[in-house]
């Protein structure tokens, strides 16, 4: 089971979409950023940069103790690797996925966030 510390933001939503598409069991743990939940000591143990989403996988890839992962891109890469889906086995295929992920995270995503923020 995967706990996703979540609030309905674009980054939170893209991880829940990945969890659904990968058919993984998960439980939403609300992280109300309007109330400041992301600054709690408990949350900072999972996501030291106080940003969500973050996950705790209680049945991690490779076994062992639960693993915490923060940052939406890192989470999606982990989930893809864990399930063997959406991430190629070849160098060319991996970097085809990575370049588009970085494009979304570094370019498109921030601009969409600004468009929404300044239209309130």
Language model features with spans:
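GST-like domain detector, emphasizing the conserved glutathione-binding G-site
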Residues: 1-120
């Amino acid at each position: 089971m995967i706990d996703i510390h979540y609030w309905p933001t674009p980054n939170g939503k893209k991880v829940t979409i990945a969890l659904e598409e990968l058919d993984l069991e998960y439980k939403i743990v609300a992280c109300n950023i309007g109330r400041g939940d992301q600054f709690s000591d408990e949350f900072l143990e999972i996501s030291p940069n106080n940003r969500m989403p973050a996950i705790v996988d209680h049945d991690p890839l490779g076994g062992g103790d639960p693993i915490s992962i923060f940052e939406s891109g890192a989470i999606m890469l982990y989930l893809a690797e864990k399930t063997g889906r959406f991430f190629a086995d070849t160098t060319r295929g991996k970097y085809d996925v990575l370049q588009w992920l970085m494009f979304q995270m570094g370019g498109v995503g921030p601009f969409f966030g600004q468009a929404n923020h300044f239209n309130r």
